[in-house]
Amino acid sequence: MIKINNCPVCGSTSLRSYIKTNSQMHHDDRLFNFDKCNKCDFVFLNPRLKFEDLKSYYSSNYLPYRGAKAWGKFEWFVSQSQKKLDLKRVKAIKDIQSLGRESVILDIGCGKPTFLKACQQKLNCKTIGIDFNDAGWRNQLNSFKKIDLRVGEVKDLPADLHPDVITMWHYLEHDYNPIRSLKSLKKISKPSTKLIIEVPNFNSSSRKKYAKNWAGWHTPRHLSLFSPKNIQLLLKKSRWNISKVFTYGTMDPYLLYWMSEMEKKGIEWDKNMEEEFIGFVFGMIKFFPFKFYEKKSSLGIMTIIANSK
């Protein structure tokens, strides 16, 4: 375990234990502690697992890696939902950047790279994805053969890459050193490069409702829990210029609510998810009216757009 004595965002030594939560979406029931910085309100896992030990929490049974197939006979419906999400993310890029054939989209923490495949199809540009392992694509290489997929960390990216758009769809909360990664990305960026970050929002109604069962903890994979205040501080310290901060994202906030309910229920996450599908759909219908309020008060997600210059 790695103990941290200074806030990773502001450097303060004034820390306090905030909450203890059990492992989520995993077969063990290990208890972990999250600290909170008294200066900038940043919440982070402390102590945290060593990187090599954390890898066991990203097995091939990890639900995001299993994707739509985890839902058995309902696979088609879930895959359509993923396609819809990917297209929302493609649109988010089109809204902030003009791209051509030689343009490069770099997705950090790409997991199963369906988003990059959608970018190829809709934007007709070059796509690069990087993750710390290849579990998200190793069994479907033919589906993603036109995408430049790499195993490694941000620090492993070449200095001459120069992406036009960098995306972090629920990656930054997993990063062991977010300031170092953001600074590294800034160094390889062009003046026109755009950065899109989507993360769970600590200052959200779902976190307040579910407390230790909030799926945003994603214990122990999520090392950082950001609020608008400290993620803006993080970006400024990394020399990125913040353009916009939204209290919502492309991901449906209902997913956080549903996963939180499943944590309360104590389901086995590596099982066939068929039996949960009907309840998932009914819950989504009941949740729909709350979405009208997410632009005023975060339900669980936030998005930050930043410029290199």
Indicate residue ranges for each PLM-predicted region.
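A C-terminal cap/extension of S-adenosyl-L-methionine-dependent methyltransferases
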Residues: I2-N5, K20-H26, T247-K309
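A SAM-dependent methyltransferase catalytic signature shared across enzymes that methylate proteins
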Residues: P8-R16, K229-Y248
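N-terminal juxtadomain amphipathic helix
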Residues: M1-G72
